[in-house]
Curated annotation (Swiss-Prot):
Record's protein name: Gag polyprotein
InterPro entries named in the record: G_retro_matrix (IPR000840), G_retro_matrix_sf (IPR036946), Gag_p12 (IPR002079), Gag_P30 (IPR003036), Retrov_capsid_N (IPR008919), Retroviral_Gag-Pol_poly (IPR050462), Retrovr_matrix (IPR010999)
Any one GO molecular-function label of the UniProt entry: structural constituent of virion
Origin species: Feline sarcoma virus (strain Snyder-Theilen)
Miscellaneous note of the record: This protein is synthesized as a Gag-Fes polyprotein.
Amino acid sequence: MGQTVTTPLSLTLDHWSEVRARAHNQGVEVRKKKWITLCKAEWVMMNVGWPREGTFSLDNISQVKKKIFAPGPHGHPDQVPYITTWRSLATDPPSWVRPFLPPPKPPTPLPQPLSPQPSAPLTSSLYPVVPKPDPPKPPVLPPDPSSPLIDLLTEEPPPYPGGHGPPPSGPRTPAASPIVSRLRERRENPAEESQALPLREGPNNRPQYWPFSASDLYNWKSHNPPFSQDPVALTNLIESILVTHQPTWDDCQQLLQALLTGEERQRVLLEARKQVPGEDGRPTQLPNVIDETFPLT
């Protein structure tokens, strides 16, 4: 009597109850007839190296899985339970599968280090050799004449303007938000720039103004969610920047330009117009005061 050759497919059929139990544990159902058809015909015709007798090779299983999970009309969602169960048997094999697992691949040998090339012999010269200076490296960002950013390594930052005398005493008004306070100061003193500037300590402990660097803006934008996704997180970030950097009006515009889309900036502008303080410190309804502080154009 001839001997029967055991293959991965025949092995799964001999242990079909365990195969169905494995599929059930993953929340799917498999049928024996379709299991055989997929293994002996459908997956073979995918031309990814799947053998008719089946295999527990993860490489072959992964190739078939890519075809099955392909988006659109090229995918085969009805075959997902079957390839998922095949992969489960290969990655977490029961005792009857282990003898049929392919041998592990040998580790890739490390490349041999290249032998150093002999250096060219030094030639005699009557004159000393003067090393050539390294060519200047191109800037990371192209220069923009209209940009307020400065090269922090080559330019001396402008000195911080001197302080003013104490404000005259008067009746106290309700405190406004940091943004509105700065905008109100700008409206009341149009001939002067805001004195709340991004500060750093310079020579002789003298405060100096430093505008936002390109890396600051890039890091804030790349490490925080968009305003449309998480407005609270981005609002907290901007409020912390206002406290720690004390930016000018132009700095605020640059910050909003980097962190918000055009539509988001328009929404922020419309909301800010509702909070423009009047002479009593409360939101005003006077159109001329609102337009002077927050023009729409």
